[in-house]
Every structure is written in structure tokens, then in C-alpha cells.
Amino acid sequence: WIMGHMVNDLEMVDYYVDKGANGLEIDITFNSNGIAEYTYHGVPCDCFRNCRRNTTLSTYLNYVRQLTTPGDQKFRQNLIFIIMDLKLNRLKSQALFNAGLSIADRLTQYYWKDDGKARAYFLLSVPYVRQAAFIRGFQSRFEEKGLKKYYEKIGWDFSANEDLNRIREAYQKLNISGHIWQSDGITNCLTRRTRRLKEAIRKRDSPGWYINKVYSWSLDRYKSIKYALDLGVDGVMSNYADRLVKILSKGTYKRRFRLATHEDNPWETFTP
């Protein structure tokens, strides 16, 4: 899985899909009441990137709906996965719950409005386990509106590099036991040790654990991308998706890996 990083306007969507990404990471901002409004990161962000690109979430979801709907004139077969990086850190408890309601509503109104013909999977990436009220709000709206059929398109991630055992406990409290990706990473401006990443991969491959997939971010250097692949990650988030495509086209990486397609289930743990 190749996720283009910080893809927050329509021009960048086209850019990363053209570069070979089969996934996009978008930043979702909320107002103080927890209403999802824009795809926007803001300053600071990754080095050598424009931090201020943005569009309204409704416009964005309408566009990617077209790109991921077979038969649409704008359909792009390789785009199958979208990570929503949820900017929740300024929200209070009730606003966190409202934010979950809001994302469920936005997906229903603008992405699944053709009764689910659009086929992308969404990973809802919450920073901290203390923000689990977002997930409860999302679940509440799904229950209220009878949207359970769309759960097959939804996965979960806690992205702030917290203790993995604490994350497991949070999922247990939320009654979530599948569709779980575990991220590990840091801005491309800095380097990060790989102890936690290795631990996540070990737990993914251990019976009884909660992790289905592991991805690393933001990896831009060829050496860093190759090292993550050698460790056994399922996905890489990068500002240079074409570099990963190039790596996967050569030598041992071509023999060991391939780019995921829509036929691959993002919620299943891969077994060689």
C-alpha cells in the first residue's frame, strides 16, 4: 500500500494517483463544535511541502467518489484506500463525539450517496486513545442511521505513537477487534528509531493480537523506504509515491512485494 502524504486538494489527488499511489492520506480539520469542514494541515508540516493546500471536505469527498466509482468517466482503478488523519487535538469531549457524528454524516452525504457504488476503503486515524469519544460518536451514528453495511469499508488507527498495549486496551473497551492498522512514524524533517515499528510488526504476526496491518510514515529517502520494506511493513506513507513504485519494480523487492489492488482486503493480515 502506497499512501501519498498530505493530499489536501484536488490537484494533489491527481498528482499522487498519477505517480502510482493506491492510497491517499488527507488531513481533516474541525470547528470548535466538532463539525468536519476542510482538508487542511497547516503549519508546521513536512519539509519541502506546501502546508496550506486545502479544500472543503464535501468537495473532496465528491471528487474521490467519482475517482473510485467504476463506470464513472473519472474512474481511476488504482485508487482504493484513503486515510483520514483526524485533527482532533483541540476538541473537548463532547466535540470529539460530535466529530465522529460529523465524519459519518459527511461520508454518507458525499461519498456513499450513490448507495455505496464508490469502492474505496477508509482508515479513520485518531491521534490519541484519550480521543476515543470520536469513535463512539462515529459508531453511534452508524447505529442510528442503519449504516452497518458500510463498516466493511471502515478501518481504525491510533497514530500518535502511543504504547501498543494501551492501544490494545482502548480497542477492547470500544469492542473493536478487526479492521485495525497500526501506524508508526514522524515527520520527514526528522529521523525516528524503529523499536516500536518492529514491535508492531511482531504483534501483527502474533496470534491473539489486534493488529491487521502496519504502516510507516513519512518515508521519503530510498534507504528508509527499503529498510521499512525489509522489516515487513504492509504500507508506506510518503511525499514521493513514485519512489516506492520504482523500488517495487526492481530486484528482490519486485520478487517479494506487489502493489495492492482492490481485490486485496486491507483488513486481513497477510500470510505468505
Swiss-Prot record:
Keywords: Cytolysis, Dermonecrotic toxin, Disulfide bond, Hemolysis, Lipid degradation, Lipid metabolism, Lyase, Magnesium, Metal-binding, Secreted, Toxin
Catalytically driven reaction(s): an N-(acyl)-sphingosylphosphocholine = an N-(acyl)-sphingosyl-1,3-cyclic phosphate + choline; an N-(acyl)-sphingosylphosphoethanolamine = an N-(acyl)-sphingosyl-1,3-cyclic phosphate + ethanolamine; a 1-acyl-sn-glycero-3-phosphocholine = a 1-acyl-sn-glycero-2,3-cyclic phosphate + choline; a 1-acyl-sn-glycero-3-phosphoethanolamine = a 1-acyl-sn-glycero-2,3-cyclic phosphate + ethanolamine
Cofactor annotation remark: Binds 1 Mg(2+) ion per subunit.
Membrane spanning stretches: none
Gene3D superfamilies: Phosphatidylinositol (PI) phosphodiesterase
This enzyme's EC code(s): 4.6.1.-
Entry cofactors: Mg(2+)
An annotated Gene Ontology molecular function: lyase activity
Highest taxon above the source species: Eukaryota
Active site: 5, 41
Positions contributing to Mg(2+) binding: 25, 27, 85
Location in or out of the cell: Secreted
Keyword Lipid biosynthesis among record annotations: no
InterPro entries the UniProt entry points to: PLC-like_Pdiesterase_TIM-brl
One Gene Ontology term from the biological process aspect of the record: lipid catabolic process
Cystine pairings recorded for this chain: 45-51, 47-189
Top-rank EC class of the record's enzyme: lyase
Gene Ontology CC terms: extracellular region
Keyword Secreted: yes
Tissue occurrence: Expressed by the venom gland.
Family recorded in the similarity comment: Belongs to the arthropod phospholipase D family. Class II subfamily.
Function according to Swiss-Prot or TrEMBL: Dermonecrotic toxins cleave the phosphodiester linkage between the phosphate and headgroup of certain phospholipids (sphingolipid and lysolipid substrates), forming an alcohol (often choline) and a cyclic phosphate. This toxin acts on sphingomyelin (SM). It may also act on ceramide phosphoethanolamine (CPE), lysophosphatidylcholine (LPC) and lysophosphatidylethanolamine (LPE), but not on lysophosphatidylserine (LPS), and lysophosphatidylglycerol (LPG). It acts by transphosphatidylation, releasing exclusively cyclic phosphate products as second products.
Name of the protein: Dermonecrotic toxin StSicTox-betaIF1
